[in-house]
């Protein structure tokens, strides 16, 4: 999955071992390791210890759309989008899952995005949006 997706997103595979692959981009690197055999039947659970989701930035809205189309052609589950949201001016994104259920996002935010203002990000008007169930 990642060996097809990451080069499409501009990352270069610099290591491809038996159980580990490493891709590098301009300011991003991802190392992905095959899970141990005893865990192969498990799925990712967002509220367990670890990652909530990983977001990759695109250079344009068109690149977001192209990535979504690529993932559809790969049979990936697209959870939502591409859509625009109020997280930041021009915030355009989609959320998808890899084959293990790990949630990822690809977005485009024009200009400096969330770094353009001192106002903190507010993904929801619900003050408890980030509380675990």
Q: Where in this protein do the model-derived segments appear?
A:
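Short beta-strand/turn micro-motifs at beta-sheet edges
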Residues: 38-44
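Acetyl-CoA-dependent GNAT
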Residues: 34-38, 109-111
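A cross-family glycoside hydrolase active-site/sugar-binding cleft signature
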Residues: 33, 55-57, 81-82, 107
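Core segments of cupin and vicinal oxygen chelate
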Residues: 1-36
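Vicinal oxygen chelate
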Residues: 44-133
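Short, solvent-exposed coil/turn segments
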Residues: 16, 25, 47-51, 87-89
């Amino acid at each position: 999955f990642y060996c097809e997706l990451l080069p499409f997103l501009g990352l270069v595979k610099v290591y491809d071992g038996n159980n580990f692959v490493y891709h590098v981009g301009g300011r991003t690197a991802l190392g992905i390791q095959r899970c141990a055999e005893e865990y192969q039947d498990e799925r990712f659970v967002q509220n367990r210890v670890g990652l909530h989701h990983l977001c990759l930035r695109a250079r344009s809205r068109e690149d977001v759309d192209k990535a979504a189309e690529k993932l559809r052609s790969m049979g990936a589950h697209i959870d939502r989008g591409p859509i625009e949201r109020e997280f930041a001016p021009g915030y355009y994104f989609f959320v998808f899952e890899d084959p293990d259920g790990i949630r990822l996002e690809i977005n485009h935010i024009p200009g400096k995005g969330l770094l353009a203002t001192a106002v903190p990000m507010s993904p929801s008007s619900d003050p408890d949006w980030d509380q675990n169930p």
